[in-house]
């Protein structure tokens, strides 16, 4: 179960309204790598975990913390929109370039759809969707996704940090940067432990089935040959990479039977 407390995990109070920054912060909320994606991914992974309680608790702890981050960013966005102009005459735009910039850059959905509050959208109004989240049932794969998600989220927060001089916003972003450092490191550690147990390739028990002669071949499919530098190096599974300069077309020319005439696939 969840139990809500009205106190935020950390400060989320800007120095002044800024609807442009409110729009930018929507990426860290409802974007592909935003906090909603982390929340739904980690909670789903934790709920479906039937293995070690250590990993289940790690995922549920972090997923629940992501709810707090959703709350913080939503609060920050709402506060950035407090007092922002929602009506302006054409003459006002001409006489006040700053107002024109604000009104031109703010997300109209903040006012029209959400009443000057946050939304589960990215800055361009695209709604968050469950396709951003991952819960495969394989914790090696999921932990790798989690490292990527935290890396992308931290990268975006670092970019947002330099898009504002507001110390209140920066204070919250500094906290998020630190927490995403922790989350990257914890998921990396879990990934390493799981790889030691199950192998570095996901899934790790298919060697007897796959065509292993292709498993460690770098195939040159471009004009450059920079990837040749990996030739002879040892992969994480202990095998050496080989290099194929001119990959062979081994599958022949595909042919197909005509479609049903009622489909009118007139193709000559």
Predicted feature residues:
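Non-heme di-metal
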Residues: 1-268
């Amino acid at each position: 179960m969840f139990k809500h407390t009205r106190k935020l995990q950390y400060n989320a109070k800007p120095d002044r309204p800024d609807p442009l920054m409110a729009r930018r912060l929507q990426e860290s909320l409802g974007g592909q790598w935003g906090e909603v994606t982390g929340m739904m991914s980690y909670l789903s992974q934790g709920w479906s975990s039937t293995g070690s309680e250590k990993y289940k608790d790690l995922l549920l702890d972090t997923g629940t913390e992501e709810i707090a981050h959703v709350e913080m960013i939503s609060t920050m966005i709402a506060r950035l929109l407090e007092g922002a102009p929602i009506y302006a005459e054409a003459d006002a735009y001409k006489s006040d370039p700053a107002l024109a910039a604000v009104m031109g850059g703010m997300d109209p959905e903040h006012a029209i759809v959400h009443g000057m509050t946050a939304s589960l959208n990215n800055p361009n109004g695209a709604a968050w969707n469950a396709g951003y989240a991952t819960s495969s049932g394989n914790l090696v794969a999921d932990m790798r996704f989690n490292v990527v998600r935290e890396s992308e989220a931290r990268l975006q927060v670092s970019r947002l940090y330099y898009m504002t001089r507001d110390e209140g916003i920066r204070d919250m972003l500094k906290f998020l940067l630190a927490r995403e450092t922790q989350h990257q490191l914890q998921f990396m550690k879990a990934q390493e432990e799981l790889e030691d147990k199950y192998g570095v390739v996901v899934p790790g028990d298919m060697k007897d089935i796959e065509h292993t002669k292709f498993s460690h071949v770098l195939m040159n499919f471009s004009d450059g040959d920079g990837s040749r530098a990996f030739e002879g190096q040892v992969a994480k599974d202990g095998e050496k990479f080989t290099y194929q300069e001119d990959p062979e077309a081994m599958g022949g020319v595909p042919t197909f039977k005509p479609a049903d005439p009622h489909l009118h696939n007139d193709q000559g």
